[in-house]
Amino acid sequence: MSSFEYPQDLRYLDTHEYVRLDGEIATIGITEFAVDQLGDVVFLELPDIGDLLTKGDTFGTIESVKAVEDLNAPITGTVVERNEILIESPDAVADDPYGEGWFLKVRVNDPDEVNDALTADEYRAEVEGE
């Protein structure tokens, strides 16, 4: 059994990003599983405030001592906030990936898009099969 958390109020991509929808604002980050797989994160590239994300497209990169990975948008919308703490100290994502370790806040175009992402149980089945 996995020791990773998969909060039920989030939706997930099989590429290990999550989205939390609160009204028309979506919070985007990466999962605890992804943080574990990456190891020590050393660099994070995120879009600027005002940039448009398109669901399924790459919006940034995360670099660790093990790998460089693309970050994929789970939803379409405009970036309204980015976590500047992670820009300065990208390794802070490991401390609280579902809380203080979020990457972006996005004003969504269509909140129903979130339903295309995996539920916590579906995501758990994906990662435990890896």
Swiss-Prot record:
<dbReference type="InterPro" id="IPR000089">
    <property type="entry name" value="Biotin_lipoyl"/>
</dbReference>
<comment type="subunit">
    <text>The glycine cleavage system is composed of four proteins: P, T, L and H.</text>
</comment>
<dbReference type="InterPro" id="IPR033753">
    <property type="entry name" value="GCV_H/Fam206"/>
</dbReference>
<keyword id="KW-0450">Lipoyl</keyword>
<dbReference type="GO" id="GO:0005960">
    <property type="term" value="C:glycine cleavage complex"/>
</dbReference>
<feature type="modified residue" description="N6-lipoyllysine">
    <location>
        <position position="66"/>
    </location>
</feature>
<dbReference type="InterPro" id="IPR017453">
    <property type="entry name" value="GCV_H_sub"/>
</dbReference>
<comment type="similarity">
    <text>Belongs to the GcvH family.</text>
</comment>
<dbReference type="InterPro" id="IPR011053">
    <property type="entry name" value="Single_hybrid_motif"/>
</dbReference>
<dbReference type="Pfam" id="PF01597">
    <property type="entry name" value="GCV_H"/>
</dbReference>
<feature type="domain" description="Lipoyl-binding">
    <location>
        <begin position="25"/>
        <end position="107"/>
    </location>
</feature>
<dbReference type="GO" id="GO:0005829">
    <property type="term" value="C:cytosol"/>
</dbReference>
<dbReference type="GO" id="GO:0019464">
    <property type="term" value="P:glycine decarboxylation via glycine cleavage system"/>
</dbReference>
<dbReference type="InterPro" id="IPR002930">
    <property type="entry name" value="GCV_H"/>
</dbReference>
<dbReference type="InterPro" id="IPR003016">
    <property type="entry name" value="2-oxoA_DH_lipoyl-BS"/>
</dbReference>
<comment type="function">
    <text>The glycine cleavage system catalyzes the degradation of glycine. The H protein shuttles the methylamine group of glycine from the P protein to the T protein.</text>
</comment>
<protein>
    <recommendedName>
        <fullName>Glycine cleavage system H protein</fullName>
    </recommendedName>
</protein>
